[in-house]
Amino acid sequence: MSQEIAVIGSPDFTTGFRLAGVRKFENVPDEAKDDELDEAVTRTLEDEDVGIIVMHEDDLDHLSRNARQSVERSIEPTLVTLGGSGGASGLRDQIKRAIGIDLMDE
């Protein structure tokens, strides 16, 4: 069984992924993120067909503490965030969380 990529975010954020063929997405308008983002993340985490969740880094600030901890600690599906100011260190942390070791450790 192959696992799919799911994208969660504003329609502006998800559109490019949908055009690229990503079939699973949750559109949450910017003005509704504080109310609806937790539910969208929970639904996606519970979807057994999803292997990777893509979100914008800034959207994590709209999640409740419990939802944020759930998505950040999830191994499968794995969270990948884009944008924001995390840069290479954010990617390093995501890789370390996903596989359990720091590949860039010197």
From Swiss-Prot:
- Where do the coiled-coil regions begin and end? none
Write out the GO biological process terms: proton motive force-driven plasma membrane ATP synthesis
**InterPro entries given in the database record:** ATPase_V1-cplx_f_g_su (IPR008218), ATPase_V1-cplx_fsu_bac/arc (IPR022944), ATPase_V1_fsu_sf (IPR036906)
The cellular location(s) given in this protein's UniProt record come to: Cell membrane
Single Gene Ontology MF annotation: ATP binding
Keywords recorded for this protein, A-Z: ATP synthesis, Cell membrane, Hydrogen ion transport, Ion transport, Membrane, Transport
Q: Which GO terms describe its cellular component?
A: plasma membrane
Its membrane topology is listed as:
Peripheral membrane protein
Family that this chain belongs to? Belongs to the V-ATPase F subunit family.
Query: How does the annotation summarize its subunit structure?
Result: Has multiple subunits with at least A(3), B(3), C, D, E, F, H, I and proteolipid K(x).
Alphabetical list of NCBIfam families matching this protein: PRK02228.1
Explain the purpose of this protein.
Answer: Component of the A-type ATP synthase that produces ATP from ADP in the presence of a proton gradient across the membrane.
**Protein name as annotated:** A-type ATP synthase subunit F
